[in-house]
Design a protein with these regions (language model features):
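Bacterial N-terminal signal peptides that target proteins for export
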Residues: 1-10
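N-terminal signal peptide c-region/cleavage motif recognized by signal peptidases
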Residues: 20-21
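Catalytic cofactor-binding cores of redox enzymes
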Residues: 146-182
C-alpha cells in the first residue's frame, strides 16, 4: 500500500505505574496552511498505558461491525494506518486518501435509543469503518447522517464506560465532528471546526470559545488542563502559528500546538477525571 501522506506518532514515556481506571482528556486540532497544506494533530491523554499498537490495514479487507449476526458488513475501499488501544479499539488513523479520524472521550455521550432495532456497529471499530469507506469528509457526513446503524459501546477492559465522539478531517481542510446526544447523531460540518477536546458537548464548547475570542488570545488565554481551556488554547494557537506550505515547517508547528495542550507526565487528579497524562501524540501530514 502506497501512502501518499505521512502519519507521525510520538509516544510519551513508558508507564511507570498504573493509575486508577478513570478516563482522560484528549485534544485534536487541524492546521490550515497555504497551498492546501493540511495537518491534523492529536494528543492521547489517559490515566494508564492504553497499550497502543499501530496497524497497517490493506484495502479489500472484509469486516463486520460486531460479533453478532445483526451487524454491518463491508469491505474496505482504502488502506489505512491505525492506532489501536488495548488492541481492541481503533482510536486514531489515516487512510491512503488522506482522511484522518480521531476518537476522543466525551462522557456525556448517549448512543442508545429505546427499542432500537438497527444493525449494530461496535464503538471499537466505528473509526476504522470511516477510514475504510471514505476519502473525504463530505462522503463521511453524507453516509453517517443516514444513521443506518446503532452504536454498541461496551465497557473498556479497565471497567471505564466507552463514551466517545469522533472528529474527521481530509486534505482539503474540511472537518466534521460526530456526537451522539440522547441516541441521536449530531454533526458539526465545516472547515471552521478545527479543534475538538472533551466535555461539554461541542455546541457548548463553541460558546465558550466565542467568549474567549472576544477577549483575544494575545491578551489572555485559559491555562488549565480542563477540556474547555485546552479547546480555547488549541483554537488560538493552531491559527496563530506560522503558516507554511512546507511540511518541514507545518508539521513541527502542529506538534508545538499539541505540546501546548498536553498534560505533564504523572498528573492525576482524583476528583477531576478529565486531567490525565499525555501518553502520545500524532501528527498527520495530509
Amino acid at each position: 500500500m502506497l501512502m501518499k501522506t505521512q502519519f507521525l506518532t510520538v509516544f510519551g514515556a513508558a508507564a511507570l505505574a498504573v493509575f486508577p481506571a478513570e478516563p482522560e482528556a484528549c485534544t485534536r486540532a487541524v492546521y490550515l496552511g497555504p497551498d492546501g497544506m493540511t495537518v491534523t494533530g492529536r494528543t492521547m491523554d489517559w490515566r494508564e498505558d492504553p497499550l497502543t499498537n499501530l496497524y497497517i490495514f490493506p484495502r479489500g479487507t472484509a469486516r463486520r461491525g460486531a460479533n453478532t449476526d445483526d451487524t454491518v458488513f463491508w469491505t474496505s475501499k482504502y488502506g489505512s494506518l491505525s492506532a489501536a488501544g488495548y488492541d481492541i479499539g481503533i482510536t486514531d488513523g489515516m487512510n491512503e486518501a488522506g482522511l484522518v479520524a480521531n476518537l476522543l472521550f466525551l462522557p456525556e455521550s448517549v448512543y442508545e435509543r429505546p427499542g432500537d432495532t438497527r444493525p449494530v456497529m461496535g464503538l471499537s471499530i466505528w473509526t476504522q469503518y470511516v477510514l475504510d469507506n471514505f476519502a473525504t469528509v463530505d462522503e463521511a457526513v453524507a453516509e453517517l447522517s443516514k444513521e443506518k446503524f446503532r452504536i454498541d459501546a461496551p465497557d473498556l477492559p479497565n471497567g471505564v464506560q466507552s463514551r466517545l465522539h469522533l472528529a474527521v478531517s481530509d486534505p482539503s481542510g474540511d472537518s466534521a465532528i460526530f456526537e451522539y446526544i440522547d441516541g441521536r447523531l449530531v454533526i458539526h460540518h465545516g472547515r471552521q471546526y478545527q479543534v475538538m477536546t472533551n466535555s461539554p458537548f461541542y455546541d457548548q464548547q463553541l460558546a465558550i470559545l466565542d467568549y474567549w475570542q472576544q477577549i483575544g488570545g494575545l491578551t489572555m488565554l485559559p491555562g488549565t488542563n480542563r477540556a474547555p481551556d485546552r479547546f480555547v488554547r488549541a483554537s488560538f494557537y493552531i491559527n496563530a502559528v506560522v503558516k507554511s506550505p512546507d511540511p518541514k515547517i507545518a508539521v513541527p508547528a502542529v506538534m508545538s500546538v499539541m505540546r501546548n495542550v498536553s498534560v505533564p507526565y504523572g498528573i492525576s487528579t482524583p476528583d477531576k477525571p478529565h486531567i490525565s497524562s499525555t501518553r502520545w501524540r500524532t501528527v498527520c501530514d495530509q
